[in-house]
Each structure stands twice: as structure tokens, then as C-alpha cells.
């Protein structure tokens, strides 16, 4: 499988990646103090911070939907602040960059759009904003072609054959255009053992979300995460709270740690995140 080019985005220009600035307040803190600082900044429980720290050695890769339907309004009922699915995708990536900086995941994450073969290595909010400058959603949803090299290990941020865990976040609002769900299921079932996948739904369309759940959610190492508004309703229906960063942490961790996959279900055991 051919290797795709890597584009590193810095302040609106391509070039070297800006280094991550460590927080001076952490210099004299022990691990407990650092975890507490991270908890306070993200407003998430200690358990989630420690789980995020536990995957610090993993590579995080995002496949982002830039098809034409992403220009649709995400929540038509929100008259005061209407946002498109594309706007919400951008905000999610900005918050992902921030969350990873807070938990000292200094590698950042790599992004590829469905209709653009270039890879983009991102570390900061400014880099995400630069990536979206003058970029508009258009085209189809070729999930099969984009996911195959990631699932089978022929493309990895550290090079072909790398053995570090790969956390793959697939952000999409529709059905694949180049393969049916049965074909997509076969691709995902054949994934390498070190690849963990979360599909983040950028839509509240019950038919689309239902198809991903029926075909893919039971595959080991795979999680389906609803959009934040829908997931928040589900979690709170079971008596829990769901902040934005808790939802985002669930997306990052859900493919690898089963307790996050079960977070929107009724409590059944001590192994479910509250």
C-alpha cells in the first residue's frame, strides 16, 4: 500500500512542528499533584486522567469526514447558535489537541480527511485552526479506502510495521460511499491487534447511527460514540453526568478499554465508568 504524504501545519504554514511548552507549575509536582492539576483543568474524574496517561505511548490518528453533508446544520433546534457538522468537527479537534496537551501526550495526533490524501500532524489549537482555514466540506465518504491501510497496519505514524498501539478515531456523519456496511465490517474485523477504533458520529440520524451500532459495535476493540448531545442524553438517563472532555476521553479510550464502551449503559458492575 502506498504511503501518503505528511503535511505538518504550523500557524497557517507548512513546516516544522512547534514544540510543546511544558507547564512550569508541574516542575515541583509529584504524579498525584500532576493528576490533580489535569483533573481540575479538564473537569474529569481522576480515573479518566489516569487512563488517558496509561495510553500515552499510543499513536492517535483521526480520519475526518469532509464530505458535502458535513455542511448541514448539526442541531436545527439550536436557533441561538446554529453550527454545522463541519463546525462541530473543528471544535472537537481543537478540544482534542487541548486535552492531549493537558495530559502530556506530546506526540499530538495525525489527521487525514476522507477526500484529501495528505496527512497533517497537529499539536495545538492554532494548528487545527490553520488546517481548517479555507477548507470546505465537499465530496463523498470513501471510508473503506481511507481505513484499510490504517486497519491492516500498512500505514502507521511511526512507519510501516510499527508495533505501538494505534488509536483510530473515525469522525463521520454518513454511510460509506465506496463499500457497504457488510464490507466495512469485514475490514474492521480483520484489523491488526494493536489497532483500536472509535467511530464518532457527527449526526443524530437514527438510521445512520443504528447501522454503525448494528454492524460494528460488537467487534472487539471497536466503540461507537454518539455525538455529544445524544451521548449526554443517554448517559444522564442512567444517572451520570457527562462533560465535554469526559465524552471526548470516552471516544479516545472506548476502543481500548471496555469500561468506556459501556459508559452510556445502565450500571452493572464496578468496571463501568461513572
Model feature map: region roles:
Residues 1-29, 233-235, 245, 251-274:
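Intrinsically disordered cytoplasmic terminal tails of membrane proteins
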Residues 16-79:
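Acidic, polar low-complexity linker/tail segments
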Residues 50-54, 99-103, 151-163, 186-189:
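Surface-exposed acidic, glycine-flexible loop patches that form ligand/cofactor-binding
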Residues 57-58, 68-108:
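…and closely analogous acidic/polar surface helices at protein-protein or active-site interfaces
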Residues 59-61, 164-169:
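Structural motif
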Residues 119-165, 176-179, 202-210:
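Von Willebrand factor
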Residues 126-132, 205-255:
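Von Willebrand factor A/integrin I-like adhesion domains
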Residues 138, 174-219, 223-225:
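VWA/integrin I-like adhesion module and closely mimicked acidic/polar interface patches used
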Amino acid at each position: 500500500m502506498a504511503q501518503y504524504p505528511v503535511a505538518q501545519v504550523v500557524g497557517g504554514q507548512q513546516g516544522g512542528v512547534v514544540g510543546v511548552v511544558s507547564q512550569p507549575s508541574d516542575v515541583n509536582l509529584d504524579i498525584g499533584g500532576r493528576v490533580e492539576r489535569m483533573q481540575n483543568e479538564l473537569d474529569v474524574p481522576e480515573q479518566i486522567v489516569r487512563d488517558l496517561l496509561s495510553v500515552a505511548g499510543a499513536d492517535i490518528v483521526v480520519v475526518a469526514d469532509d464530505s458535502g453533508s458535513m455542511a448541514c446544520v448539526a442541531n436545527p433546534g439550536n436557533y441561538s447558535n446554529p453550527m454545522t457538522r463541519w463546525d462541530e468537527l473543528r471544535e472537537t479537534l481543537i478540544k482534542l489537541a487541548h486535552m492531549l496537551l493537558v495530559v502530556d501526550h506530546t506526540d499530538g495526533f495525525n489527521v487525514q480527511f476522507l477526500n484529501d490524501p495528505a496527512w497533517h500532524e497537529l499539536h495545538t489549537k492554532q494548528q487545527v485552526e490553520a488546517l481548517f482555514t479555507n477548507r470546505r466540506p465537499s465530496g463523498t465518504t470513501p471510508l473503506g479506502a481511507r481505513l484499510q491501510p490504517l486497519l491492516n497496519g500498512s500505514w502507521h505514524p511511526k512507519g510501516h510495521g510499527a508495533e505501538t498501539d494505534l488509536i483510530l478515531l473515525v469522525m463521520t456523519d454518513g454511510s460509506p460511499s465506496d463499500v457497504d456496511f457488510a464490507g466495512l465490517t469485514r475490514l474492521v474485523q480483520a484489523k491488526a491487534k494493536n489497532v483500536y477504533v472509535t467511530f464518532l458520529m457527527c449526526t443524530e440520524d437514527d438510521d445512520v447511527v443504528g447501522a454503525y451500532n448494528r454492524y460494528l459495535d460488537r467487534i472487539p476493540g471497536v466503540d461507537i460514540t454518539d455525538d455529544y448531545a445524544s451521548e449526554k442524553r443517554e448517559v444522564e438517563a442512567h444517572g451520570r453526568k457527562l462533560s465535554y472532555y469526559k465524552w471526548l476521553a470516552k471516544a479516545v479510550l472506548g476502543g481500548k478499554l471496555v469500561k468506556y464502551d459501556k459508559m452510556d449503559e445502565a450500571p452493572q458492575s464496578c468496571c463501568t465508568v461513572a
